[in-house]
C-alpha cells in the first residue's frame, strides 16, 4: 500500500509512545475486550488482521478473500478472526473510530461495507472524508449527533493509536494488511488459496 500520511496524524500518534512504555508490559498477542472478534474462541487457529481502512489491498482482502475464509474456516470453528486497526492516515483513523461506535452484532457488515465503498469516502482532504463517511453512516441509521459524538470520542482514538504502537513494537508492521497467524507474522494481502495452504498446514500438524 502506498503510505500517504499527514504530519499532524503522526505527531498525535507519537504522543502515546511514552504512555505505552510506562504501561504494563502486555503482549500484542493477548486478546482483550477491546478487540473485535468473530469465530469460536476455542478455535485452534487465531488470525489477527492489522488493516487500514483507507488501504486498497485491505479492501481487496475484505471484499474478495474474507467471505471465503469466513465460510470455510471461521464459520466451521477452525479459525478465530481478530480485526485490529492500523490506520496510516486521517481517513483510516476516522473510519476506525466510527466502527468502534457500531454494535458488535452488526459491526462486521458495516466494516465490510466501508471497505466496499472505500473509493467514495477516502480522500486526502479530511473535510471531504468526514462528509462522505457521514453520508454512509447516516444511510445505516446513525444520526448526526451520534456521528459527532463518535468523532469526538478521544477514548476510542487513544485505543486505536495505542494499538498501532503496540503492534509496531511487537511485530514491526510496515504495511497493511498484515496478519499474525498463531503468533507468526504474514505480511501482505493473500488470496484464499494462500490462506488455505497456511491454515491447512497448521491444522495437519
Where are the language model's segments positioned?
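Extracytoplasmic thiol/disulfide redox context detector
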Residues: 2-8, 14-89, 161-169, 200-205
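Cysteine-centric redox/oxidoreductase cores and disulfide-bonded domains
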Residues: 87-176, 180-193, 197-204
Amino acid at each position: 500500500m502506498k503510505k500517504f500520511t499527514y504530519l499532524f496524524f503522526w505527531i498525535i500518534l507519537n504522543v502515546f509512545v511514552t504512555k505505552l512504555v510506562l504501561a504494563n508490559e502486555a503482549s500484542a498477542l493477548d486478546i482483550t475486550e477491546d478487540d473485535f472478534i468473530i469465530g469460536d474462541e476455542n478455535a485452534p487457529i487465531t488470525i489477527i488482521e492489522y488493516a487500514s481502512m483507507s488501504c486498497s489491498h485491505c479492501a481487496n482482502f475484505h471484499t474478495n478473500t474474507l467471505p471465503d475464509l469466513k465460510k470455510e474456516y471461521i464459520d466451521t470453528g477452525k479459525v478465530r478472526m481478530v480485526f485490529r486497526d492500523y490506520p496510516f492516515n486521517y481517513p483510516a483513523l476516522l473510519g476506525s473510530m466510527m466502527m468502534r461506535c457500531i454494535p458488535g452484532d452488526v459491526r462486521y457488515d458495516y466494516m465490510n461495507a466501508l471497505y466496499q465503498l472505500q473509493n467514495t469516502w477516502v480522500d486526502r482532504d479530511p473535510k471531504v472524508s468526514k462528509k462522505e463517511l457521514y453520508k454512509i453512516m447516516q444511510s445505516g441509521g446513525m444520526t448526526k449527533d451520534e456521528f459527532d459524538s463518535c468523532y469526538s470520542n478521544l477514548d476510542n482514538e487513544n485505543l486505536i493509536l495505542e494499538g498501532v504502537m503496540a503492534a509496531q513494537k511487537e511485530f514491526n508492521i510496515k504495511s497493511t494488511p498484515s496478519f499474525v497467524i498463531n503468533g507468526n507474522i504474514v505480511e501482505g494481502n493473500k488470496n484464499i488459496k494462500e490462506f488455505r495452504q497456511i491454515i491447512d498446514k497448521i491444522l495437519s500438524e
